[in-house]
């Protein structure tokens, strides 16, 4: 790189994002449990919509995403004018940082929070502020103490990735009420559908003018390969985000498939119930062999080992058995492995392999 050609401040401080592994050298048909994907895939209705979309590939997609926005609004009881759609919830996070953060401002998030918060903050030249958690759970008081007149955005995944822990409505309300006047609370609800009865902050959004929610179709809807997400918030904020959103940021295929997916809530309910059953089973099975985890409300558990060496050794053993899980040292949890909840056979297989590893120690 020429000394005269330099990127904007903060860009070179960004560590390249590393996604979950998808294969193991020398192993055919390895079972991927590293990216929190739905083992049952998308709704059959979503698959049908995907196939139908091939007949209009020569046409530009809509610029206002009206069909998908109205479908989301109908399912969740929202105002469609306050829904914004993006290329995964990542793009909504990026929009928020582009619109409200920048040099000499702070973006706050928790120490084990989603890595994209730091990346998006640095990309706009903002100062990332990492706040300690308490036993791998959000500490509202610590977040409030970290806020200053420079704070513009506070990102909180609830349930959190990679811990699976979450805080209740009272704590969320206290956090929103305690933020500086210029700050926006962004509630990342990527895993909200896995929590029965949880509104992901919708009530707070209606009560206050400083709360925005992001959601994704990559998890329970099984559309990770398509990259579709959405956000909801005060009309004034959504209007700002739409001003920087590209007019054709989502393809017709993305829009029509996601619309069919969100309308099939029977599929969502089945996936949620199956996930809850096997999440509890796997957590209990691992606890019985000395591998604890916090109560997870998402579609994964964070298995804790005695130290980094044991976690890495277990990961290597799992790979020899054709099982791919996620190391989370990048989240400051080097002694842990994040394990996606698969179907029954997958959960039994990973529990057996970890038990085998523990017996060999």
UniProtKB/Swiss-Prot annotation:
Q: One GO molecular-function annotation for this sequence?
A: histidinol-phosphate transaminase activity
Q: Which reaction does it catalyse?
A: L-histidinol phosphate + 2-oxoglutarate = 3-(imidazol-4-yl)-2-oxopropyl phosphate + L-glutamate
Report the domain of life of the source organism: Bacteria
Q: Any one Gene Ontology biological process term? A: L-histidine biosynthetic process
Subunit info here reads: Homodimer.
Which family, according to the similarity comment? Belongs to the class-II pyridoxal-phosphate-dependent aminotransferase family. Histidinol-phosphate aminotransferase subfamily.
Record protein name field: Histidinol-phosphate aminotransferase
Q: Which organism is it from?
A: Cereibacter sphaeroides (strain KD131 / KCTC 12085) (Rhodobacter sphaeroides)
Q: Gene name?
A: hisC
């Amino acid at each position: 790189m020429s000394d005269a050609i330099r990127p904007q401040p903060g860009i070179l401080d960004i560590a390249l994002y590393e996604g979950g592994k998808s294969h193991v050298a020398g192993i055919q048909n390895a079972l991927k449990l590293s990216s929190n994907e739905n083992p049952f895939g998308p709704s059959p209705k979503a698959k049908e919509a995907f196939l139908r979309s091939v007949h209009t590939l020569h046409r530009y997609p809509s610029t206002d995403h009206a069909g998908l926005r109205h479908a989301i609004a109908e399912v969740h009881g929202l105002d469609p004018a306050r829904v914004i759609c993006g290329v995964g919830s990542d793009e909504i996070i990026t929009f928020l940082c582009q619109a409200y953060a920048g040099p000499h401002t702070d973006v706050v998030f928790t120490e084990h929070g989603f890595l994209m918060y730091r990346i998006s903050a640095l990309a706009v030249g903002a100062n990332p502020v990492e706040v300690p958690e308490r036993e791998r759970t959000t500490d509202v008081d610590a977040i409030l103490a970290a806020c200053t007149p420079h704070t513009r955005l506070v990102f909180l995944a609830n349930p959190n990735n990679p811990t699976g822990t979450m805080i209740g409505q009272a704590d969320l309300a206290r956090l929103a009420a305690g933020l500086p006047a210029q700050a926006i609370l962004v509630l990342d609800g990527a895993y909200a559908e896995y929590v029965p009865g949880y509104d992901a902050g919708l009530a707070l959004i209606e009560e206050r003018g400083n709360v925005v929610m992001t959601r994704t179709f990559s998890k329970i809807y099984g559309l990770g390969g398509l990259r579709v997400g959405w956000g909801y918030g005060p009309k004034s904020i959504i209007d700002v985000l739409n001003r920087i959103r590209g007019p054709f940021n989502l393809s017709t295929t993305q829009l029509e498939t996601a619309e069919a997916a969100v309308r099939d809530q029977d599929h969502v309910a089945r996936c949620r119930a199956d996930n809850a059953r096997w999440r509890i089973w796997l957590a209990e099975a691992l606890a019985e062999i000395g591998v604890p985890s916090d109560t997870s409300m998402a579609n994964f558990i964070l298995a804790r080992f005695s130290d980094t060496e044991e976690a890495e050794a277990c990961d290597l053993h799992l790979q020899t058995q054709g099982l791919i899980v996620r190391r989370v040292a990048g989240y400051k949890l080097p002694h842990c492995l994040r394990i996606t909840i698969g179907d029954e056979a997958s959960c039994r297989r990973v529990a057996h392999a970890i038990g085998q590893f523990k017996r060999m120690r």
